[in-house]
Amino acid sequence: MHKFNYRSFFRSIIPVILAAVMCSCVNHSYQSYTDTIKVNGVSLFYAAEGAGKPVILLHGNGGSHNDLETVHRQLAQAGYMVYAIDSRGQGANPRLPEYHYKDMATDVYEFIKAKGLEKPAVFGFSDGGNIALQLEVMYPGTLGAIATGGANIFVHGSLVPEFEQGFLTQPTDEPLVIMMQNEPTMTVEDMKSIGCPSLIMSGENDLILADHTRLIGENIPSGEARIISGEDHGSYICNSPKLAPILIDFFNRIGY
């Protein structure tokens, strides 16, 4: 009669059991894809990656989601579901004859609703920061948190004087530049209406005045301003590994 070899049996079955356990621990909700969505009468290209609480990334004027690829990847790996959107008429989207921040804010608001996102956090760089602030002013209670880098809420007096003088008087027929010369048109009172925790940043050598950054952050009830030492408008943001740790620390501090 053949004697059953328990030792050999368990040696052969243990790797199978361990493999099954490991598979059960994998986060099957992790996603990575790109798509285009129609909102507010325009098509928006976006890249999505991760699993967990939603974070929306908004690039600067004339840029694309690719500018934020590093922070996108780092946040996804840290446990967030990240959506990097190409703003209307920019990146992979068809160009448009004119642009307004309020339209872009509505675009992102409708994106949030279409995707069924519950109080997402938004990080916006430059124009993207303007859009994030404008969104929460227009649609209060939509966002769970705001972080901005190099944002401004109005034009005159928000930029370093040597840049502002030449920029605002420069003749142009470029629609995106025309928008920046005339918008945004938000106010300090608008900032006081923002209810979500907000981190308002600019670089020490930014085009945006440090005093303007402080004006925004200090007038949002749950806001804070931070000037990033040694950095310019986008050096700590555009495909830089420096931004994600700042955002993750902010999200942790506010319980997001």
Label for each model-derived stretch:
Residues 230-256:
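Catalytic active-site module of serine/aspartate enzymes centered on a nucleophile-bearing elbow/loop
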Residues 194, 200-202:
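Short beta-strand/loop motif that positions the catalytic acidic residue
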Residues 124, 128, 132:
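Gly/Ala-rich beta-loop-alpha elbow adjacent to hydrolase catalytic centers
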Residues 134-138, 146-174:
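Flexible "cap/lid" loop of the alpha/beta hydrolase fold
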Residues 77, 87-120:
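Active-site loop/oxyanion-hole signature of alpha/beta-hydrolase fold enzymes
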Residues 45-91:
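Conserved HGGG/HGGXW glycine-rich cap/lid loop of the alpha/beta-hydrolase fold
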Residues 207-212:
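Conserved alpha/beta-hydrolase "acid-adjacent" motif
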Residues 174-190:
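Active-site nucleophile elbow and catalytic-triad environment of alpha/beta-hydrolase enzymes
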